[in-house]
Amino acid sequence: MPSEKQPARPQAGSSGRAKSEAFRAAERARERRRRILLAAAAVVAVAAVGVGIAAAVAVDGTKTHTSATAASDAASATLTGPAGPEVIPLEQGTVLAPASTAAEGQTVDGIQCQSNEQVAYHIHTHLTVFVDGVLRPLPAGIGIVKPVAQQTASGAFYEASQCYYWLHVHAQDGVIHVEAPNQTTYTLGQFFAIWRQSLTTTQVGSVHGAVTAYVNGVRYSGDPAAIPLRSHEDIQLDVGKIVAPKKVDWSQAQL
């Protein structure tokens, strides 16, 4: 497992309290990243156990939903694929747009880019995009300025060498991290603004066509840019051909 640089200890002085808080925030973020990397290292073992559980379920004909959002998610199909470093399936295929188009540190729609990940408000939302029925992944590194990849047994996990926007993506698994200094409602449109990609009822990224949006398996009416980002929410955008809404299994992810 890659080693992680220890954050510098805060120094005494008039700004000691602020530095102490920054240090504590960095420690919390570092601990979260450590848990993610440990989880990634255990994916193979978890998958093996999962095979046994699936076989048992098939025998007795019953199943149990442990995901916090499973009961409220109307989508009947679950996204599948190799588990990534956040124990959410990695998205395969041609990315919708490169992460390199994203903003490079300037404030975007009130959202700042800071050297440490903020932890006062910390949730995760999943976004899936289909274009004419074909999955178009979100690339890792959106909202992470000058990203650096940490290689894990389950794929790359990106961290910033400069700063993190409060909305960002660590891996190519569709998970949008909302990590902000205060609790407020952020939107999908703000995420696309950081990415510098279009999002309207007729366009997603550079792709034009009728856009159908789903939130937790339920069709969303209105401007997709206004969709709020909420904890363990599954958002799906279909450009052109409509795909039956899908969800992810959050129950194994430490998110």
PLM regions: where:
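Ubiquitin-like/PB1-type beta-grasp interaction modules and other compact soluble beta-rich domains
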Residues: 2-4, 50-255
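Terminal targeting segments of Actinobacterial cell-envelope proteins
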Residues: 1-34
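Hydrophobic single-pass membrane-targeting/anchoring helices
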Residues: 28-62
